[in-house]
Amino acid sequence: MTQTTNGSYGLGDFVLQSGIVLSNAFIGYQTYGALNSRRDNVIVFPTWYTGTNGQVAPYVAKGKALDPEKYFIVIPDMFTNGSSTSPSNAADPHRDLDFPLVTPFDNVIAQRRLLEEYFNVTGIELMAGFSMSGQLAYHWAALHSDLVKRACSICGTAKTSPHNWAMLHAYKSTMEASPNWLNSACSEWDPKILTIVSSIGATMAMSQDWYRQGQHLSGDIIDVASAIENLKSLFASWVPANLYAQTLTWMAADVSDNSTFNGDLAAALAAIKIPFLMMPCNTDLYFRVADNEAEIPYMSNATLTVIESSSGHMAGLPGFSSDDDAFVNEQLLKLLRIPSIN
């Protein structure tokens, strides 16, 4: 039986990139497998927008890239997802809408502390991520290559694109439009706001082709309206203030926005020397193939492999499509076979 653990690690007073201190911060995690004697047989796969650590499970199995009999697999929870420090559980004065911006940079610092301070990890064979955690892969590769040997971004980019930012602004402004947003609506969903947020998600997460093919129809889901109703359950499970804070994190994603690169995106991409795999989906409406194509000329050791699928952004979501999962797994296996440079 595969060894698994769930837990959280206390980070103490965690200084954010902004200089604001999160008191008694903590990071949640799930692990599979066991560390070897060198403590370097590690794969890291953080959570994503609306993701929690248990959702990576479809990628984890004997013989797969994320093989718990071969690797120690760590699934860190991103700040704001409810399992790590978030608006809903933060210490005063950072509860609810007083929660400060937490950047991808901050998340990676916290994840590295978890790995080194708690698990005493000495090396990472692969850092992979989907969507928002695919954006974290760029941060790991550009800023922490002393620890990580390979990285993969599945349906992600080094910086949130203008169109992606505009979509996120739709989520943000919709939540802010709730009549009681500054009071109870940040902790409990206004039904009308929940419907609008779910409609935005249904519009953007899957492609036009996916709907045209009738992929949304199954069981009680007989039309697009009932598909949106079904998606409500995902968003309803989130505290609105947590989703709001996670939206701000996604909007702020930029691998060059730190004191190392000072906003020079080309320099940040050029700093990625380890084997790096970009895996966009050809029908993704969030992260376009063209966005990755624009990045790759600056990177000396990167490969771009396209997921050909009608699933849109969900092509990279573990468990959404068995065909997409199989393709992603095969590409990760190939990446793991590439010799490391460090």
Predicted regions and their residues:
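Gly/Pro-rich cap/lid or specificity-loop segments adjacent to the active site
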Residues: 22, 50-136, 142, 146-168, ...
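A short loop-to-beta-strand scaffold at the N-terminal edge of the catalytic core in hydrolase folds
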Residues: 22-34
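Short beta-strand element of the alpha/beta-hydrolase
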Residues: 39-50
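Alpha/beta-hydrolase-fold enzymes
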Residues: 147-149, 153-233
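Acidic catalytic loop of the alpha/beta-hydrolase fold
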Residues: 250-254, 282-287
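Short alpha-helix in the alpha/beta-hydrolase fold that links the catalytic acid
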Residues: 258-265, 274, 285-298
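Short beta-strand/loop motif that positions the catalytic acidic residue
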Residues: 272, 278-280
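Catalytic active-site module of serine/aspartate enzymes centered on a nucleophile-bearing elbow/loop
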Residues: 293-297, 301-342
